[in-house]
Amino acid sequence: MGVLDGKALPIIEIAPLSGFYDYKNKYQAGSTIETCPADLSPEKTAEMQKYAETAFRALRLKNYARMDFMMGKAGDIYCLEANTLPGMTPTSLLPQEAAAVGISYEQLCEKLIEVSLRERDR
């Protein structure tokens, strides 16, 4: 999920229609179902968002990033990686997550510039 200015965005669930989420499933149109916000309980959503924000701070990240997680069948959450340069096309995951809370692509780009300039001026 994306973290923008230290605050987690909604979770996006990625479910490949077959196999694993590999290169083919990531880039071939129609190979995955992306659901945002993810169909999780409010408690599990809050837990995962807290982990994303905590990892963001622990890694001393700035401005924005996308934190990738997997959830096991029992609901265990595993942090896979911090992506410090996530895709930023209009259909990339971070813009989809922002759109889920009413932030347009244009507004997201403006927000990224705003937080970057604020960080630079510190």
Where are the regions that the model predicts?
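Electropositive phosphate-/nucleotide-binding environments in soluble metabolic enzymes
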Residues: 42-49, 88, 99-106
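Generic C-terminus detector
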Residues: 93-95, 99-122
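Short amphipathic alpha-helical segments
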Residues: 49, 53, 109-110
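Phosphate-binding site of ATP-dependent enzymes
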Residues: 1-50, 71-78
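Conserved metal-phosphate-binding beta-hairpin within the catalytic cores
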Residues: 1-3, 57-88, 98
